[in-house]
Amino acid sequence: MIFSTSPLRRPRAALLAVALSTALGGLYFAPESVQAKPAVAGEVDIAYQEFTLPNGLRVIVHTDRKAPIVAVNIWYHVGSKDEPAGRTGFAHLFEHLMFNGSENAPGEFFNPFKQVGATGQNGTTNSDRTNYFENVPTTALDMALWMESDRMGHLLGAIDQKTLDEQRGVVQNEKRQGENEPYGQVFDVLGEKMYPVSHPYHHSTIGSMADLNAASLEDVKNWFRTWYGPNNAVLVLAGDIDLATAKEKVAKYFGDIPATPTMAQPRVDVAAHDKDSRSTMTDQVPQTRIYRVWNVAEYGQPDLDELQLFSQVLGGSKSSRLDTRLLHQDKLVDSVSTGAFGAQLGSIFFLMADVKQGVDPAKVEAVIDEELKRLLKDGPTATEVAQARTVFKAGFVRGVERIGGFGGKADVLAECAVFTGDAGCFRDSLETLNNATAQSIRAAGDRWLSRGSHTLVVTPGPRVALAEDPAVTPAPLTLPAVDPKYTTTPGVDRKTGIPSTDSYPQLVFPELQRAKLKNGSTVVLAERHDIPVVQVSYEFNGGYSADAGHKLGTSSFAMGMLDEGAGDLDSLAFGNRAESLGANLSAGASLDGSNAYLSALKENLDPSLALYAQMLRHPRFEQKEIDRIKASWIAGIGQEKAQPNGAALRVLPPLLYGVGHPYAMPFSGSGTEASIGSLDREDLVAFQKAWVRPENATVIVVGDTTLKEIVPLLDKHFGDWKGEGQAPAVPAVSDVARPAGTRVYLIDQPGAVQANIFAGEVVPSSKDPGAVRFDIANAVIGGDFTSRLNMNLREDKHWSYGARSSTPSALGQRPWIASAPVQIDKTAESIAEMRREINEYFTGKVPPTQAEVARMQAIQIRGLPGSFETAASVLGTIGGIVRYDRPDDYVFKRKAEIESLTPEQVKAAAATVDPKALTWVVVGDLKQIEAPIRALDLGEVSIVDADGKPVAGAK
């Protein structure tokens, strides 16, 4: 199945998430050091070279020296599409198994990477491929290649029944976690409706419980022997590396791995529908949602690029036709989105709309059909084509800033190579977008969207567990003959262990340059000239805490309204102008402040700043837009309350801080239905005048500019800006006392297959001298994958997909929160384990060990050189420097403090938390969890609703 279980978002900024435009078929291995095609004129490019080992491993190399890191990205051409009946979920299960150590590196695969400061490490599986990726310091590349090659060539001896059972349990809890979310079963239904039983995309990537339970150790090993060889993989190395180095190291570590069978890929099968179909389902959701899906052209077809542009015009932006009609004119929905998502055998065009309360979904469907038919008949306008093209080209420019991670340059090259055989196929996609016309876009839409689609309508009601397909006894897995590919003599003696990393790159952070604008604002600039983009963030006081004594949610709502029309431009015109410039503008609030953000293409910096200034200085706050956003906002609060995590994080803050405290509000800052419902234009204007003003504000600029260039431009647009009246004082955030004893609050979620457990307490401010020490203390207990809580509940007990703890930043006391989603029948046991771990750690009974502290120091310190690869990461760090009055060299001082920490200091910092004063919030099916939790005798137990109000009649 090709559907993601995450909510639909706007089409990804990088156009390369879509199908890329070369024909599918057998992989073509280009000669070494040869690039397939020249870049499209005027475009940002990803230069690469490549070679292929004798055993079939294809290696692609991209050099980018801006940071001393290398992205290692390996794609195996196997996914859920390759699973036979009775073995669903095998590809995803193996993704997990391959993180559990190999023959020569037993234990957690993450550990050696953590020790060298690797960043962005992850693995994913979808219908078509499995990938693993990480960014490592250049000096740790040997370690990374040794580890990746060991699990490719030396894994099976490390997989035993215990490991299989452990990871099977983790995967099953991942499945429960996804299905426990609102709309969480939708994509399983869509897969079944869009593809016949015989189609490789019919079943879900995560598989069925029955097949997961039936997986035998020999089945799993034979699956690996079939698919995970060098001749079925593409390795991309991007960053601080060159071709010669890559050749030497890859041959050394991978060259002796024998090839596996050459497996034929399934034929392209778009599974077109001859006519429209529909289905309905009920779920524990706050509002009706409409999904409409078409099967469309596969990866590698220019039509899919054209459909991306079609999607952008139809429903891909705030000024799209469906947004204009359904949100602005007819006011029938709270949100609408479209997207085209590529896959190897056939892609999907996806539409989703959240129907307003009280609106007949049939009316929404009728408007969707009307607008779709109009666009298919007449095509987009020239302006719409130009704007859509600019949006995607700007997104590509922003996306290629990163060498690794989701959508980074290594990901782009691997995706192209695996699915089209041409690592440079993104250039074809760019060319298609450059050459697209209104007629070609309309024609592509007509070819695919005039065919049958499936509509699924989800309405509020009971959640009914989906029946799984009947269990099938799988046919014996017969291994095909292995190709007699030549391999080299082993280049390393693996019995000597993992290569050591003896040195690490120096931390480099951009020099912060400062200036003053004529309006009194401070400018802080960090130059970054790797891509032609400039990012700006105007930082103000007045965040959620400013809502205290006023209507909760005012700060977030007011800031969110700034880009809904400004100056002479109404909401739609403002969106159109931003898209035509390729600019991203937004504004929002956080606990202690607010900010307005601009990402501008260098070529359009001046007009983008002009639009940005209009947004901040002259927001329109039109009543019709207030009414529209208010309705959507209230619906969003309903969505928060329907999600287990969202409900808990709305209820917890008032319990930690006490009613009336500036922080005693939902951590989302969204307010309540009542407070948002009572907001009027005067409230928004008052907030904007009081807090969005240049005095005491800071403009952070990161990107392709200089102080000499940017200050005159900022003065041009903001120099004469003055605040009205006296600026209000920053809200005083007083400390609160902890409760005298443990408290437990339960929120009912009938029928839930998981319980979501939260435990919280207040700890000192981010400005406290001991804040860094506490951050390391938190990392040991729950702030890292290798932490005590996660190793216990996920890796040892496999009751949870992941347990963690965190301490968000705050000027006042910070909330420390531990959390874990667990299988419903292990709720009380999981709480008992969490309580034991927390009590033993924070009381000093089982204090942090030297090894634990050293591990967290290594993770924090050695990852720093790679942490500032992107302008966004630099911008965020400067934002913290500004908000918390830190020195400009804070990143270096923090590094030095972490390096100097001892276990005794971390133990003392951990003593900040009092395990006897914890507040527990648990969301789950009370029929299953209430009695076992009460039997734990943690403390007083209260039953509350998703607003934190006592439930009448509860014990």
Predicted regions and their residues:
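Bacterial N-terminal signal peptides that target proteins for export
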Residues: 2-18
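Bacterial N-terminal signal peptides
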Residues: 14-28
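Proteolytic maturation boundary segments
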Residues: 26-29, 33-59, 242-282, 293, ...
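M16 family metallopeptidases and their MPP-like homologs
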Residues: 60-62, 67-85, 89-93, 107-154, ...
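Short, conserved charged micro-motifs
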Residues: 141-143, 243-247, 302, 359-363, ...
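A common structural junction motif
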Residues: 149-159, 253-261, 369-380, 615-621, ...
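Short, conserved secondary-structure transition motifs
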Residues: 170-178, 269-283, 388-400, 600, ...
